[in-house]
Amino acid sequence: MHKTLIALTLIAAQASAAPLFSDDIAAGKQPLTYLGKDSKAATALLLTQKADGGDAVARIAADSPVTILLVDDKGHALVKNAFGLTGWAQADTSGAAADKLDGLQKVVIGEDAFIFYHDPKNSTFLNEIASGKDEEPETYRALRGKLAGDDKDYFVYCDQGMSGDPNCTIFPVPADGKAPTETAYDENRTLNGETYYLPGDGSVYTDTQANLFYQTRSKYTLKGDKLEEVIQPYHYIGVDSKAENTFTLDGLDGKKHKVKKGEKVRVILDDPRAIPCKEDEICKLKLLVQNAAGDTGWVIPDTYSGEEDK
């Protein structure tokens, strides 16, 4: 009996140590180390909000492409999936289906004003103009379908906003089944952006720069008549750029690294909750940036001028 318990313990330990990726990833020698390495999932993966677990962000099927962004000193890896969502990788033993983004049909409404990727099996592209009288922007009746993974029908209405801010509102079809001529902006139902992924399983994805500094990928869960954001640990940016001013990086290696004006840089991540937004002020960013020498660190730019926040 004692030998059996030892054997089971060894099997469990080996299972827990099974590789998550097709490449070997070693623990870093510092709290966080940037890798930026493309790989594949060696098993089904669950991306979580925290390094040791926490709420789920996304599920990835085995053999799917991933990019390993960061590794901590305990060997936990922060990755992004093919869509661009980030999370800490864990082995997914739940048997739950992976996020469904492949095979969706692309449709466009309003002269490229809005782009949708949807599943025609559970939703119908309407491509109708609902309203747009006087100086109000045109409202597009874009889709109708079962978007929450159940039998409930939803409409998707979109408009460009009074100041050119594209947004879409997702709401249950009224009891009489008729399509309203308009719908009001609702913080619980309306998302900013022009590109949407609607697989029909209760998840809604956006890929947009509307009201944002960088192109950002987000995920929401549709529950009843509300949309709830799925919180990612970081937002992936992945943009090559040039420094508009000289600034200093707080390096992941604990050192300070200068970046000269005009130097090529790569903006990797945004930590969206590092600096809480203040009312009536432009929200500040905390960006993970790599300089031309390959040094990686954090910087808080002045969002008014583009300079480093002193």
Briefly describe each language-model feature range.
Residues L20-K74, I109-G110, I115-E128, Y236-I282:
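Beta-loop motif signature
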Residues Q160-G161, A179-K258:
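Short aromatic loop motif centered on NTY/YTY
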